[in-house]
């Protein structure tokens, strides 16, 4: 390659980087604005809750504070450090907790596209590297921060295993896991297999005080390469009996140390008003069903629910789901 052509390529690459930086800046600003809108609806965090990355009982305390005061904790998929910083800044400004989460693709982005992802090493390393950076910064922002990883389908269990190994190593050295929680999304598998795999991993996670999120039913739309946009409408709604099956399978292993991403018509992506038919009464009916079947007293909401595909939802819709 001639020096002239090499310089031309470098100049083009530099221009591309400038354009990318401009896009990143705009995206970060947009994320910060959206995060502020959601977070400002929350009750201010009391000083009794730990600031910085929270795990174990500290995380449960944050969840219970949200449950008792009737607000949701926003979760933002971060694919670059500038987006992560925007979330931290928004949480600080609103004095509210924030869930910072990484997808499999986000992990690869943090690691750099030049790395091979043999045995999921790059996806794991990218998530771990950004998690360590968040841990160093989060305590300075003065609010509880939840470190989480998003959808992990059956074909990505190697990624999940690598993340748990990193958690176990961190726990051995620091007495807590690196991440607060992780999500298993086996919603496309038979429910029996979904629950069996979740049980196996929850036993391992409970040993290091790491929280599990699981999915039952299918969230429509497309995210991180998983396309459910053609799913039949009836499959976008979980049944109370199915949610109760999850409760029966996981509650004996780690009481209240898991959450359920149930389907109530929610979809990934932003759609025109009227195109998404949310039925949050499914969540309320499931809570009542579990209370009745289990004979629970003194608790109106025994299950932690997750609202997937919340982008584009109105404040009224989020409030109704809560």
Q: What is each PLM-predicted segment?
A:
Residues 310-313, 318-322:
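Active-site/pore-lining binding-face segments in mid-to-C-terminal subdomains
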Residues 57-65, 81-120, 125-142, 154-304, ...:
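Alpha/beta enzyme core
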Residues 45-51, 70, 74, 86, ...:
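Metal-cofactor-binding active-site regions of metalloenzymes
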Residues 40-74, 297:
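N-terminal amphipathic alpha-helix/helix-capping segment at the start of soluble metabolic enzymes
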Residues 1-28:
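N-terminal chloroplast transit peptides
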Residues 29-42:
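Acidic, proline-/serine-/threonine-rich low-complexity intrinsically disordered repeat tracts
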Residues 78, 147-153, 303-313:
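Glycine-rich beta-to-alpha transition loops that act as phosphate-gripper elements at the mouths
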Residues 75-77, 99-101, 146-148:
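Short, conserved beta-strand segments within well-ordered enzyme catalytic domains
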């Amino acid at each position: 390659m001639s020096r002239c052509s090499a310089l031309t390529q470098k100049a083009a690459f530099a221009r591309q980087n400038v354009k990318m930086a401009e896009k990143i800046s705009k995206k970060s600003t947009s994320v910060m604005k959206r995060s502020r809108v959601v977070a400002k609806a929350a009750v201010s965090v009391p000083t009794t809750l730990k600031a910085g990355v929270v795990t174990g009982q500290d995380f449960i305390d944050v969840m219970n504070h949200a449950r008792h005061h009737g607000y949701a904790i926003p979760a933002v998929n971060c694919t670059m450090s500038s987006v992560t910083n925007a979330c931290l800044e928004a949480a600080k400004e609103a004095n509210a907790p924030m869930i910072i989460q990484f997808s499999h693709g986000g992990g690869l982005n943090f690691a750099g596209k030049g790395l091979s992802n043999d045995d999921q090493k790059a996806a794991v390393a990218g998530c771990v590297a950004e998690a360590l950076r968040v841990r160093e910064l989060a305590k300075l922002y003065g609010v509880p921060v939840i470190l989480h990883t998003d959808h992990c389908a059956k074909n990505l269990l190697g990624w999940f295993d690598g993340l748990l190994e990193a958690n176990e190593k961190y726990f051995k050295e620091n007495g807590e896991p690196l991440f607060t929680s992780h999500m298993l999304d086996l919603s496309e598998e038979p429910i029996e297999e979904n629950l069996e795999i979740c049980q196996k991993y929850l036993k391992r996670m409970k040993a290091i005080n790491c929280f599990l999120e699981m999915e039952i039913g299918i969230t429509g739309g497309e995210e991180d390469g998983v396309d459910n946009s053609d799913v039949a409408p009836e499959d976008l709604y979980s049944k109370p009996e199915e949610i109760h099956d999850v409760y029966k399978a996981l509650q004996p292993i780690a009481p209240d140390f898991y959450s359920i991403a149930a389907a109530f018509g929610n979809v990934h992506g932003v759609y025109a008003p009227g195109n998404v038919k949310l039925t949050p009464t499914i969540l309320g009916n499931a809570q009542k069903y579990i209370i009745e079947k289990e004979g629970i007293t003194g608790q109106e909401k025994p299950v932690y629910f997750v609202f997937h595909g919340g982008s584009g939802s109105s404040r009224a819709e989020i409030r109704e789901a809560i």
